[in-house]
Amino acid sequence: MVIMGNELQLENKILKGTTTVGIRVNDGVILAADRRASAGFFVANKMVRKVLYITDKIGITTAGSVADLQFIYDVLKNIYHYNSITKYGPISIKGIATRLANVLSATKYFPYIVQILIGGYDDQPRLFNLDYLGDITEENYVATGSGSPVAMGVLEDEYNPKMTLDEAADLAKRAVFSAIKRDSFTGTGVIVAKIHSKGHEELEFYLNKKM
């Protein structure tokens, strides 16, 4: 896709400042992200949370404008809870991703500056990647943000759909740490979420425990 003018500026805002990773295997989904927030070349915050949860079995990773991401996170929670109290019952992960894609597509001329991974477990593990235009793809593994070229190289080299959830968690951790070493907008440490049929577990890893 050729990006020009304002679209290039938006793309740069989304790419600069984070690295997130998603991996899908038979037992569940891994979501991982670093903890650094940048304002230009300034490190604005060293302990930002970029892995969030809609339910115990559905999570997201975030990249982009903080204000837009907070709004979109509220939208996602409202979509899930609204469906849960209606006759339709709980919405699927694919349904949530599709609804968000519709929201983003409808506002593409005045877009929310976001890049979202939605992953979780309903009747099976699912992982979706959405950009600010509402484009949606289902993935087995994916990386977003400024460190994504480095992280994606690790994933491409080592991903195996038959790997266990623990092995996938270790791969995601190493992919983000590889980005931390090479990308100045990615840093501090990594949050890794393991989402499976019984819920989720979260692990944290840091370059320096005193940070």
Swiss-Prot record:
Its EC number is 3.4.25.1. The active site is at T18. GO terms for biological process: proteasomal protein catabolic process. It is an enzyme of class 3 (hydrolase). Its main location: cytoplasm. It is found in: Cytoplasm. GO terms for cellular component: cytoplasm; proteasome core complex, beta-subunit complex. It catalyses: Cleavage of peptide bonds with very broad specificity. The keyword Ion transport does not apply. Residues 1-17 form a propeptide. The formation of the proteasomal ATPase PAN-20S proteasome complex, via the docking of the C-termini of PAN into the intersubunit pockets in the alpha-rings, triggers opening of the gate for substrate entry. Interconversion between the open-gate and close-gate conformations leads to a dynamic regulation of the 20S proteasome proteolysis activity. InterPro entries: Ntn_hydrolases_N, Pept_T1A_Psome_bsu_arc, Pept_T1A_subB, Proteasome_bsu_CS, Proteasome_sua/b, Proteasome_suB-type. CDD domains: proteasome_beta_archeal (cd03764). Keywords: Autocatalytic cleavage, Cytoplasm, Hydrolase, Protease, Proteasome, Threonine protease, Zymogen. GO terms for molecular function: threonine-type endopeptidase activity. PROSITE patterns: PROTEASOME_BETA_1 (PS00854), PROTEASOME_BETA_2 (PS51476). It holds the Pfam family Proteasome. Belongs to the peptidase T1B family. NCBIfam families: arc_protsome_B. The 20S proteasome core is composed of 14 alpha and 14 beta subunits that assemble into four stacked heptameric rings, resulting in a barrel-shaped structure. The two inner rings, each composed of seven catalytic beta subunits, are sandwiched by two outer rings, each composed of seven alpha subunits. The catalytic chamber with the active sites is on the inside of the barrel. Has a gated structure, the ends of the cylinder being occluded by the N-termini of the alpha-subunits. Is capped at one or both ends by the proteasome regulatory ATPase, PAN. Component of the proteasome core, a large protease complex with broad specificity involved in protein degradation. This is Proteasome subunit beta 2. It comes from Saccharolobus solfataricus (strain 98/2) (Sulfolobus solfataricus). The gene is psmB2.
